Amino acid sequence: DYLDMVELVSDYPEMKATFNLTPVLLRQLEDFSNGAKDLYWYYTEIDADILTLDDKKFIISRFFDTNPKVIARFPRYVELRNSSQNSSSWTNQDYRDLQLLFNLAWTDPKYLAQEPLKNLVSKGRDFSEDDKFVLLNEHSKLIDKVIPTHAELWKTGQIEITTTPYAHPILPLIFDTNLASVGDIGAELPKNRFSKPTDAAIQVEKGLDLAEELLGQRPTGMWPAEGAVSQEVLGMFAKEGIKWIATGEHVLSKSLDIPTFKRNTKG
């Protein structure tokens, strides 16, 4: 979806949008582009004919980690899910099909409607090891396009990109754990108070540094992790050139001392 969403915006040149790309996500995308593999990728690559018992246990237990509505799009996937409780009778082909269908299910429908993945969807079952290679190769290509596509649209001015403090911290609590009681008077505070304003400032700086390194520009907007803000940390954003931040309405309503925001058909 990371690529699909920004490509959708590019299809409508008059449309403007803001995307938040966290440093954690950017670093993961960079790692994948440089050849890193997660466990799911690793277990997908293994030839189904040489899967060990432990390999099969992992695949059975984790390769149905998909929304049931998505699984329902693939008849063979449904068939495998329904028989997974009796996997002792599964063939190597069953495992191979599951390896591939799990990855197809996690692919945006836009790309499933395009070749070469369209052919795999049409095939539906009895996949080969070569089919797995085609799928994983296509996934690599999609991953490689995420950062450059965002950077290009940001350069043209059609989108703005914001980011988040580096390791996705709850920034006010890094600044001072006692700040938890500002938003929640009854909050249970830690016995040992933690307060590292310098660390909090570094989180902001490093997040912006990474975004600038990988995207070619330094963001002027930021989305604090979980929308967590406090008066004490606002100056840290401003010091780094941040002009605006995003958070939730409940934070604003508490700041304005009003119960909630009322909505009508116009918003």
Describe the residue ranges of each PLM region.
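Carbohydrate-active enzymes and regulators
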Residues: 1-267
